[in-house]
Each structure stands twice: as C-alpha cells, then as structure tokens.
C-alpha cells in the first residue's frame, strides 16, 4: 500500500493540476516560475547554467535539481568544444553525482524532454507545503470478491500540496513547437 500511495502522491505533487488534487510543481498555473525557456528539445549546458542562476542566491543553498531520467541522460551527453563530456562523475566513493555542485533527484513523473513541456526544476522544495487532510484509512472488502475466493483492500488518503513561494523553485521550459 505504501508504495502505491507514495507513487500517487509523487505524481500529484509534481504534475497535479489543483482540480481535486494538489497543485504540482510543474503546473504552469500555481507551480514554479519559469527560469529559462530552451529554444528546442536539445538542452544546452548554457540552458542548465541559466536555470541555476535564474534562482536567487538565498534559495540556491538548499536547492536540488528535479528531472526525468531522459533529461539526465541528455545532460550527461553534453560535450565541450573539444569533445569532452561536461558531466563529471563524483570522485568520492559513496557520494552521488551532482549538477553544478548541487544534488539531483529523478522521477518518472517529471515530464520528459518534449516541446511545450516544463522538463526540469531547480529550487528549495521546503517552500512546497503538504497538508494531510485526513489520515490514511484501509478497508477490507470481503463481499466484493467472495465469488472468486479473494479479499480486496481499499486504501484512501486526502492530501493537498502547493508551492507557497513560487520564486523558490524555477523550471526549464521547452519552447512549444512552431513558436
């Protein structure tokens, strides 16, 4: 139950539209502010650097990158003018890689690289507030599956979430096709 509830919460907190669910960080209305708009679906290192500096310095101290695995892959493939990869893996054992010396987290619910999408966020997520409106409840459903000899369970929870200070998190948006 915990994994499924956690996955649904993660999805809502990242891409929820605020209608009967939390307002997600990547929602264009009520979510994070746009920091940078990439010209196309090929992200450049300049785009990443511009996103970093679009976030005000006080928020950078606790900032974390949030992106999809496909975006991490695109960033890892970036090369300098001499053909060397810009991404440098961690040199300390047990310490994860970083982007511009800040940690990153991936989620399947962060939109993938595509035109018109917000594909990456950078910021201090302590300004995303989560409220539990009611505790988790579990119900055993004996009768529903009695004819097949099975027992069902129903879990429910009511939560809400919203970025209360939109300037604390910035996104990298990809320009919509044809614009």
Segments the model singles out, each with a brief description of its role:
Residues 1-179:
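Structured, hydrophobic secondary-structure cores that serve as assembly/anchoring elements
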């Amino acid at each position: 139950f915990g994994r499924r509830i956690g996955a649904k919460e993660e999805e809502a907190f990242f891409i929820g539209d605020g209608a009967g669910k939390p307002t997600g960080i990547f929602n264009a209305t009520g979510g994070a502010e746009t920091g940078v708009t990439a010209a196309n679906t090929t992200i450049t290192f300049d785009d990443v650097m511009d996103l970093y500096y679009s976030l005000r310095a006080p928020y950078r101290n606790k900032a974390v990158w949030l992106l999809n695995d496909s975006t991490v892959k695109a960033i890892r493939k970036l090369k300098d003018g001499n053909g060397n990869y810009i991404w440098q893996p961690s040199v300390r054992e047990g310490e994860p890689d970083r982007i511009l010396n800040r940690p990153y987290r991936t989620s399947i619910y962060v939109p993938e690289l595509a035109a018109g999408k917000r594909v990456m966020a950078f910021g201090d997520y302590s300004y995303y507030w989560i409220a539990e409106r009611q505790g988790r409840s579990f119900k055993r459903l004996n009768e529903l599956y009695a004819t097949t000899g099975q027992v069902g369970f129903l879990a429910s929870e009511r939560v809400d979430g919203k970025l209360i200070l939109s300037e604390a998190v910035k996104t990298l948006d990809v320009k919509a096709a044809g614009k």
